[in-house]
Amino acid sequence: MDPITAEILRIGISESAKLIFQKVLSKNWMKEYTGGRSIVEQLLSLDIQSDYIVKHISRAMKMRTIHSSENDVMLNSIYHPLTIHREGKNIKVDDKFLLSDNNITNIIGFAGQGKSTILRKILLESIKNGDKIPFFMELRKIEAKGIENSLLSIIEELGIKTDKKSLNSLLSSGNILLLLDGFDEISSKMRMDILSEIILLNRRHGVQIITTSRGGTEICTESNIINYT
């Protein structure tokens, strides 16, 4: 087991993930979301739960910094509370920080300002304190495949037996949080396609989405998206 995964297990993220799966499963599920519920039921399997931590969360928690350019470090070992701003209000992103709604939220910042770090902190706190199952994706790595297809691949990689219909059911259930990092890093020819998919996922399914981007990109000026700086 690599040191980052060992640290994640040590601080209790595995147990937190189990609790959030149980919390989501215990909600009142409408009949049309049966396929989505099946995905959550499978997440409670010990092997699949372990893979969610090792193959998904652990990967997202590994970071490189200026002082550690050749080795991965754990988010918690380097994180100092950062602040985001909106409408004259300063909001500190620290322990127990949550954004829980059905909106598209975009965190804007310069290169090196901490956007990706903040998004990873939101991922961590969502597992520890939230009521939705979070999935983290780096947009530059999935732009060719798209968000929904990439999410399906992540879920299938965990060993979950599912299909597109069940995934759509899960997305529409209100129990998923999508964390999409680096809109500005998408190739210019793919940006409008990815932005359209982000908007469609939110409008069709009501799924909560949090993105990051440098200023001046298409997502920063799109209507009905909440921007933080």
Predicted stretch roles:
Residues 2-44, 48-229:
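P-loop NTPase signaling cores
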